[in-house]
Amino acid sequence: MNFNVGDKIVYPMHGAGIVEAIEERSVCNEKQAYYIIKMPGEVKVMVPTAKAESIGVRNIIDQETALKVIDTLEQDRTEMSVKWNKRYRDNVEKMKSGDIYEVADIVRNLTFKQKDKGLSTTEKKMLLNAKQILVSELVLAGNKEKEEVEQLVDNKINTSYELHSVANVVDSTDVSTANVIKKFIPQT
């Protein structure tokens, strides 16, 4: 897949950016073409054009897909290993995949875990990195400001956490609004 200057792309493990230039550079006496990608925070990344596809560089999602990704943040957490090192390896693989749904899953699950029990320093860093990757793509896909997207992501996850935490406390399979209210509000 070839990209052009101005294309909005995603570089797995780094996030979304814009192809600012395509330049030929000499590395180890070998000339090679590189995409110069402007990432959030004024960071620039060079990716060899010949290897871009094999390392997972792709076009950003469209607005319709962005809305679906945001909707996934409202779902309940998915199964994670109780062993932190296995959970960490699983999450690294998800992030390497470049799949935005997997990244959203990591952000939601680790945020839920942080609210429940807290996170290790390593998982806190992973959460921050995954959230930056998620937000960077949603910003470019929706032509929105970073702060607006961060607030939206936080609100969706917080609402989901409250909903699913309450639902998990209710001993019944009926988690209708009426049943949840009966459980937590004393009846007079």
Task: Identify the function of each model-found stretch.
Residues 50, 55-188:
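Charge/polar-rich, low-complexity and marginally structured segments
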Residues 1-57:
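A positional/architectural concept
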